[in-house]
């Protein structure tokens, strides 16, 4: 039987919306508004074109039960705009009124040639009115463009095909052999036909072939109905290893029925549609075999392992404790498998789906207007039965609201379910608020103030009731009151004070201005003002927190820089200390005469005492005690000259940040050097005094190889100066590092007076 295409879940509300709302592509709407903005609204001809475009904007009957939303486009992501929304309708109405009231440019001026010239005041009045009308039209077009670009419009009034069907719970099902099919659907049909041929050939029921696949030449006819029944039956397709049969029901409208009351109803028939699929990409023979073999082994172990386990447990002799433990473990495994098998066999054929509060909360959190009711499991607990009952209440209340037959009681039932499970669904809350406003307006806009109302004791009168009294009122006790329906509607509406939905309620309210309603409007305004104040305060607090975070980050950076500087300073100080001690330890000893040298370096004990000393005298005493100042080692250098050399080493490797005890070294070097060489002052020639004032590297005038050889032998090397006589003057002492580790050595001296 052929199946017609159609929407499932299509109702009266959607039918009315399709007839009254106009839809248009978002790109087309933007282009149209931009063209209106570029049009001169002061020309009468242009006004007519704009008015015609506004009145025919969009397409009505854009969808129906048999016409899919956006079906005329091949792109499913095309965006369509609903022009029937309340905000869009108001803006378009203002634009239409502005266009209809405009008269165009210069009616009196253009008609001046046909009769008497108009007066000056008449022309000025006409130009002023025309300017105001043009400004009103331009403002209306600009307002429409601004609203179209807002997030509210794009989120609530713009749809794709999938989002529209998901919002209104529509499902497009069915197929028709008479309708034209797209390329994608044609490919699916061909693929399904090929799958049917493959299955028929494998099962041996292919037309004009026997079981072995041999072609039958003289077969008179083929009974295609039997072939289709065999192909689509579960018994036949299940034997094919790659066949999958899917069956589902589709409601199809077979006709309409008109009653005596001229009420037309549609006759709906459920049609079963079956699809046969073939999986050509994977084979599961090995998986079936492994599972079957595993089941067989487990069954054999449960049935045949009892005697073997008893044999292991009762065995004596060597290894008996190990066998007993192994038997105990096998026995526990056997009992566990036996319990699992018993439980599986007892529940065979029973599919139980449990429902807990966790699953219900997840269902409510992700609720998207699903209307399928849960089934109660066999032998469920009372708690599960209550959860399923709450789900049924929710679904039925939502169904009544969607079908436009619900009231505030249905909205309250949905709210109670969400509040009972302490779940907040923002989308559902906004939808419920909107439905509350619609239900309340349907009651209040049609109500009138009754005259000569007589209320019994305890009944609340809306003529004198306050806002708080309406909210705290027990509506069940007011059932006999003349204001019962209005009281319920106002109570539900007053709960929305401070929300955007209450603003919509105020705009659409046409009922009596009760004192409680006026008080609710004032409270709503106060709540809105307080909301803006809170938003401003929140924004200021966020800005203050940002500044605090930035200040904290800046303090952290400064602290990191200071910490890094301190660490670098300590490392620098430690390096200076190590270099000073190494330079002192590597000083050449007093030679034993000639180039042979002799003696040893400063002992480690003297260097440790020097490092731990806190005053100048203690450090100098530590170095003096560590020197070998015996007469046999003083043949070339005097003790004063050796002390001077030590001072030069301290000067070269210590700075003002190293140690306070080294300041006397740095301040007294020049004086000590001069006083340490009194005999050489008068005997130095002019050339010699010039040379003695030089502070240069020892590598000047000395080859690198000779310098390294002299350093290795502890021999003093001096720069060669031709043509000068030293007489009895002893050359300046070499200070700094001795050549070990490529240390730099300097010649330090003070200029001498002639």
UniProtKB/Swiss-Prot annotation:
Name the gene.
CP-CP2
Q: Which family does it belong to?
A: Belongs to the virgaviridae capsid protein family.
Keyword Acetylation in record: no
Name of protein: 84 kDa readthrough protein
Q: Which InterPro entries match?
A: TMV-like_coat (IPR001337), TMV-like_coat_sf (IPR036417)
Keywords (alphabetical) are: Capsid protein, Virion
Q: Mind listing the GO molecular function terms for this protein? A: structural molecule activity
Q: What else is known?
A: This protein is translated as a fusion protein by episodic readthrough of the termination codon at the end of the capsid protein. Readthrough of the terminator codon TGA occurs between the codons for Ser-176 and Arg-178, thereby producing the 84 kDa readthrough protein.
């Amino acid at each position: 039987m052929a199946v017609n295409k159609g929407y499932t879940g299509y109702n009266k509300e959607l039918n009315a919306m399709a007839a009254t709302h106009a839809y248009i592509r978002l790109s087309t709407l933007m282009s149209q508004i931009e063209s209106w903005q570029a049009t001169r609204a002061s020309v009468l001809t242009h006004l007519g074109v704009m008015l015609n475009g506004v009145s025919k904007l969009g397409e009505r009957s854009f969808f129906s039960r048999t016409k899919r939303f956006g079906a005329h486009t091949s792109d499913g992501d095309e965006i369509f705009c609903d022009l029937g929304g309340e905000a869009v309708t108001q803006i378009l109405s203002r634009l239409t009124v502005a266009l209809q009231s405009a008269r165009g440019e210069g009616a009196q001026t253009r008609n001046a040639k046909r009769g008497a010239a108009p007066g000056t005041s008449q022309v000025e009045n006409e130009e002023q009115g025309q300017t105001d009308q043009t400004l009103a039209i331009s403002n209306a077009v600009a307002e429409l463009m601004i609203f179209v670009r807002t997030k509210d419009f794009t989120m609530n009034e713009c749809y794709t095909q999938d989002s529209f069907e998901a919002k209104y719970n529509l499902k497009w099902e069915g197929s028709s052999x008479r309708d034209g099919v797209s390329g994608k659907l044609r490919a699916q049909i061909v693929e399904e036909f090929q799958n049917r041929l493959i299955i028929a050939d494998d099962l041996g029921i292919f037309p004009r072939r026997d079981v072995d696949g041999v072609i039958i030449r003289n077969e008179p006819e083929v009974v295609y109905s039997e072939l289709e029944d065999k192909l689509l039956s579960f018994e036949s397709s299940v034997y094919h290893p790659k066949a999958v049969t899917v069956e589902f029901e589709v409601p199809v409208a077979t006709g309409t029925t008109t009653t005596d009351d001229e009420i037309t109803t549609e006759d709906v028939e459920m049609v079963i549609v079956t699809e046969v699929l073939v999986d050509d990409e994977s084979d599961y023979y090995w998986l079936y075999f492994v599972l079957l073999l595993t089941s067989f082994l487990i069954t054999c172990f449960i049935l045949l392992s009892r005697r073997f386990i008893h044999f292991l447990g009762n065995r004596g002799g060597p290894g008996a404790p190990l066998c007993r433990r192994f038997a105990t473990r096998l026995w526990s495994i056997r009992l566990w498998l036996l319990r699992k098998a018993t439980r599986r066999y007892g529940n065979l054929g029973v599919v139980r789906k449990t429902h807990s509060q966790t699953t219900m909360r997840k269902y409510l959190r992700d609720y998207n207007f699903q209307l399928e009711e849960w089934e109660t499991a066999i032998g469920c607990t009372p708690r599960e039965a209550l959860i399923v009952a709450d789900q049924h209440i929710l679904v039925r209340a939502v169904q009544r609201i969607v079908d436009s037959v619900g009231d505030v009681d249905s909205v309250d039932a949905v709210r109670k379910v969400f509040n009972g499970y302490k779940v907040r669904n923002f989308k559902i809350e906004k939808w419920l608020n909107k439905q509350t406003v619609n239900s309340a307006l349907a009651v209040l806009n049609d109500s009138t103030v009754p005259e000569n109302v007589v209320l019994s004791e305890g009944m609340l009168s809306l003529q004198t009731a306050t806002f708080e009294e309406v909210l705290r009122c027990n509506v069940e006790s007011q059932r006999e009151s003349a204001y019962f329906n209005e009281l319920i509607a106002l109570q539900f509406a007053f709960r929305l004070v401070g929300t955007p939905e209450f603003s919509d309620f105020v705009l659409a309210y046409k009922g009596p201005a009760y004192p409680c309603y006026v008080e609710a409007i004032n409270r709503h305004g106060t709540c809105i003002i307080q909301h803006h104040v809170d938003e401003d305060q929140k924004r200021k607090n966020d800005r203050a927190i940002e500044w605090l975070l930035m200040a904290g980050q800046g303090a952290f950076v400064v602290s990191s820089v200071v910490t890094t500087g301190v660490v670098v300073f300590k490392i620098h100080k430690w390096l200076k200390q190590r270099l000073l001690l190494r330079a002192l330890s590597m000083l050449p000893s007093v030679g034993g005469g000639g180039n042979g040298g002799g003696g040893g370096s400063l002992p480690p004990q003297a260097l440790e005492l020097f490092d731990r000393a806190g005053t100048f005298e203690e450090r100098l005493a530590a170095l003096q005690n560590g020197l070998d100042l015996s007469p046999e080692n003083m043949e070339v250098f005097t003790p004063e000259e050796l002390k001077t050399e030590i001072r030069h080493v301290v000067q070269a490797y210590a700075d003002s940040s190293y140690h306070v005890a080294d300041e006397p070294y740095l301040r007294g070097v020049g004086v000590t050097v001069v006083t340490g060489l009194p005999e050489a002052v008068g005997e130095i020639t002019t050339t010699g005094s010039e040379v003695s004032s030089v502070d240069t590297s020892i590598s000047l005038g000395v080859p690198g190889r000779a310098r390294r050889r002299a350093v290795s032998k502890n021999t003093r090397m001096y720069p060669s100066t031709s043509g000068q006589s030293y007489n009895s003057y002893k050359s300046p002492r070499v200070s700094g590092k001795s050549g070990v580790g490529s240390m730099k050595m300097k010649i330090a001296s003070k200029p001498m007076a002639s």
